[in-house]
Amino acid sequence: MPLFMDIHHLGDGVTMEDVAKAHQADLATQGGRDVNYLRYWVDEDSGSVFCLVEAPSAEAANSVHRDAHGLVADEIFQVQEGA
C-alpha cells in the first residue's frame, strides 16, 4: 500500500488538542475506504500539521479528511519509510 505524508498549513491557533480531535474523526471515517491514518505531528508555532497515511492514492487519503472534518491537505507527498 502506498504511504503518503500530507501537510496542512492552518496558521495561528492550531492546537494539539484540536488536531487530536480531527485525527479521531479521520479514524472514524476511514473504515471501508482502504485508508489508514497512522500518525500525525503538530507545529503549533507555525500552524502546520503533518499526517502519515496508507492509502491507494493521495485523493483517497484527502477524501477522508474532507468527509471527516473538511480540513483537506495543502500538499501531499508519496513517501517511503526508512529505518
Regions found by a protein language model. Give the residues of each.
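An amphipathic, aromatic/His-enriched active-site/gating alpha helix that lines ligand/cofactor pockets
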Residues: 30-32, 54-82
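Short S/T/G/P-rich N-terminal loop/turn motif that feeds into the first structured element of a domain
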Residues: 1-31, 36-38, 42-47, 81-83
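Short hydrophobic/aromatic beta-strand micro-patches
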Residues: 9, 52-54
